[in-house]
Design a protein with these regions (language model features):
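Non-catalytic cap/lid and distal C-terminal segments of serine-dependent acyl enzymes
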Residues: 1, 90-91, 161-163
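Conserved alpha/beta-hydrolase "acid-adjacent" motif
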Residues: 114-124
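Active-site nucleophile elbow and catalytic-triad environment of alpha/beta-hydrolase enzymes
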Residues: 75-97
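Short, conserved loop/helix-junction motifs that constitute active-site signature segments
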Residues: 97-101, 132-134
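Short beta-strand/loop motif that positions the catalytic acidic residue
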Residues: 107-109
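Alpha/beta-hydrolase-fold enzymes
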Residues: 1-70
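Catalytic active-site module of serine/aspartate enzymes centered on a nucleophile-bearing elbow/loop
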Residues: 130-167
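Acidic beta-to-alpha connecting loop that harbors the catalytic carboxylate
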Residues: 111-114, 145-146
Length: 167
């Protein structure tokens, strides 16, 4: 769930990652690149006790995330490059091979998820699916929710919505 919006700086970011990887190696974990990619995500939720407040409206989820040693890591430069490559591929209409135009596509996201950047950018992603030929493209934004909509206190509602779409 969630839909990262296209970032016009993705090509420049990828070039920076590649240059940094030549100097540091592709397994290097760059604090600078992490800040460039995710640093602004928490801004709308300040003041916040965690740099990961952007993940969830539910403070218990954020506290558990902060406490989990497997969470909160910094991507390697290779990881950032892959993330940017995927974004550039997904948002390039030339790369889509339309085989099943009737396949339903449903976007769902928290309305306050910083990955979607803005509702307008989110709707551009929805529009791209129509542009490449999908005929049944719909979306739902969940009011007040952030990135991890399937872990919120109201998750049963979201799972019910998903179940209804699948039936």
């Amino acid at each position: 769930c969630g839909c990262p919006s296209y970032n016009p700086a993705a090509k420049m970011g990828r070039a920076m990652v590649r240059a940094m990887a030549k100097l540091k190696g592709d397994r290097y974990r760059s604090q600078k690149m992490n800040h460039m990619m995710f640093g602004a995500f928490n801004t709308p939720f300040q003041p916040a006790d965690s740099e990961f407040a952007w993940l969830s409206l539910n403070e218990e989820n954020v506290t558990a995330y902060d406490a989990d040693e497997l969470c909160g890591f910094i991507f390697t430069l290779n990881g950032f490059e892959s993330l940017l490559d995927i974004m550039l591929m997904v948002y390039d209409p030339k790369g889509w091979k339309m085989e099943r135009p009737g396949l339903p596509v449903w976007f769902l996201s928290g309305e306050q998820d910083p990955c979607l950047t803005s509702k307008e950018r989110f709707l551009e992603a929805v529009g791209l699916m129509k542009k490449v030929g999908y005929q049944d493209v719909t979306y739902k934004l969940y009011d007040g929710l952030r990135h991890e909509i399937l872990n919120e206190k109201c998750k049963e509602t979201i799972y019910q919505d998903i179940l209804e779409k699948l039936e």
